[in-house]
Amino acid sequence: AEEYFRFLQAIEALSPDKDAPVRLASSGLVSQISPPVFAASCSPDAQTCLRRLAQYKPLIGALLYRVEETETELSVELVSARAGLELPEILVGIEFVFLVGLIRKATQEPVTPLSAAARQPVKNPDYAEFLGVPITQGGQDRLVSAGVFRVDGRVRQQKPSAGCLTALPFV
């Protein structure tokens, strides 16, 4: 895990383009080559999608997803697969963009999380710009939504889409 995190930090440090991590995470290339991501994107709803990603994430990365669901919220916390190892900014940003991008592509809706928080300050503004919400500094690397995600700030039923996630209520 530590070597993977250093690898990502080196990419961030050497890239002259600050938008490169956002483009990488939102490109869709990962879902084309990753069976767990493809399977998750073919889930009947966002909750199942996130649970499947959490189940298989250890196979494709050095971090874990902790998915929590209440009556009003669905959240994903990013946790290092190695206890005590803090996630670098680039990994938190890429994972947030990846998760929101996956839901957007599957639903064909401009979904926006209600909040995003990171343990370390996130200096690259492109992550927050992609998400549509600021990334605040907090005690966890966490993406939170009410219900699932909001669309244009209004409550609205999910219209059928060509993607796999079709039964998605929005707040």
Show which residues each predicted segment covers:
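Short, mixed-charge aromatic SLiMs
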Residues: 2, 33-37, 117-130
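Conserved binding/catalytic microenvironments
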Residues: 24, 39, 43, 47, ...
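N-terminal low-complexity or simple alpha-helical regulatory segments
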Residues: 1-74
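Generic recognition of short, well-ordered alpha-helical interface segments
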Residues: 3-6, 48, 94, 157, ...
